[in-house]
């Protein structure tokens, strides 16, 4: 009986010791949930190393600006802390790693909310939703489909599609166009260059990015053809560490009070 009692006491002490040691392993002020952010006095927000105007970009005066930067600044102000931007993520998928590892409190970086990423981090409600779209090389498209055949051609698309490597659209392409030949490029600019050079038949991204390309190329209607999907959308959301439920709850309430903008409104208000 005495032996059993000693065993129970030992187990109780051991479990409490484990809890204490685990707690000591998290230095004060480094947590990404609200308490840790307030204690630290700053909100660490991750964006990619490559500019994504109009969401975040360095303007002609050398200032980091854009829609996502303004959104992050408002959140820091509401929390009463300073904003720190980290650009250690080379690609969009790398943002998820930064947040999951605790090196950033959140990612506010035109980040698509996908099932694969949601295995690692938690996402807010979308603060923006775009239509997905294909942008075709019009000359190359005319060789495989007439104007009236384009919709049926796309439903069973077997052509080449250019996407950004390690992006949500690399995954979307595999799911939505299983018979297509998918070519990954380091940047969107590289993909668009391949499109205009005729190296790929189309590029795949959201409506905002496609509209930016069309606006940047003189007489683009003669060389390029956009196709937007009403049934395929791209929800843009904020990612936080899976354990930080209170922070996620706060972010969702914050977003409820923000005006949702369309792709055209963002382009008009944040012209690079």
What are the functions of these language-model segments?
Residues 24-28, 164-177, 223-224, 252-272:
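Ligand-binding clefts/hinges and TM-proximal coupling segments of bilobed small-molecule sensing domains
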Residues 93-94, 110-119, 171-175, 196-197, ...:
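A ligand-binding cleft/hinge motif common to bilobed small-molecule-binding domains
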Residues 25-110, 119:
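Extracytoplasmic small-molecule ligand-binding "clamshell" domains
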Residues 43-44, 80-82, 100-109, 159-160, ...:
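Alpha-to-beta junction loops
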Residues 75, 98-100, 154, 195-196, ...:
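Hydrophobic residues within well-ordered alpha-helices
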Residues 82-91, 163, 180-187:
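Short beta-strand-to-loop elements that line the ligand-binding cleft
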Residues 125, 138-160:
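Flexible hinge/capping segments at coil-to-helix
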Residues 49, 128-136, 140-141, 207-256, ...:
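Periplasmic-binding protein-like
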């Amino acid at each position: 009986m005495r032996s059993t009692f000693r065993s129970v006491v030992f187990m109780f002490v051991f479990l409490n010791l484990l809890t204490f040691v685990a707690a000591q392993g998290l230095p004060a002020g480094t947590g990404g949930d609200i308490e840790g952010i307030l204690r630290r006095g700053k909100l660490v927000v991750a964006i990619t190393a490559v500019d994504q105007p109009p969401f975040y970009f360095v303007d002609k005066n050398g200032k980091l600006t854009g829609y996502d930067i303004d959104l992050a600044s408002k959140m820091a102000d509401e929390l009463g802390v300073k904003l720190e931007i980290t650009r250690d993520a080379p690609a969009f998928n790398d943002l998820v790693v930064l947040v999951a590892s605790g090196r950033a409190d959140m990612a506010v970086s035109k980040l698509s909310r996908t099932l694969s990423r949601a295995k690692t981090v938690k996402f807010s409600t979308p603060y923006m939703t775009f239509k997905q779209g294909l942008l075709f090389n019009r000359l190359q498209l005319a060789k495989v489909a007439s104007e009236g055949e384009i919709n049926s051609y796309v439903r069973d698309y077997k052509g080449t599609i250019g996407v950004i490597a390690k992006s949500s659209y690399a995954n979307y392409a595999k799911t939505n166009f299983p018979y297509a030949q998918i070519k990954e490029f380091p940047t969107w600019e590289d993909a668009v260059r391949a499109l205009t050079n005729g190296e790929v038949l189309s590029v795949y991204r959201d409506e905002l990015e496609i509209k930016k390309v069309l606006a940047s190329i003189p007489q683009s209607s003669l060389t390029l053809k956009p196709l937007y999907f009403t049934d395929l959308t791209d929800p843009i959301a904020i990612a936080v560490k899976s354990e930080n439920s209170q922070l996620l709850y706060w972010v969702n309430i914050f977003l409820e009070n923000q005006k949702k903008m369309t792709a055209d409104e963002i382009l008009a208000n944040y012209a690079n």
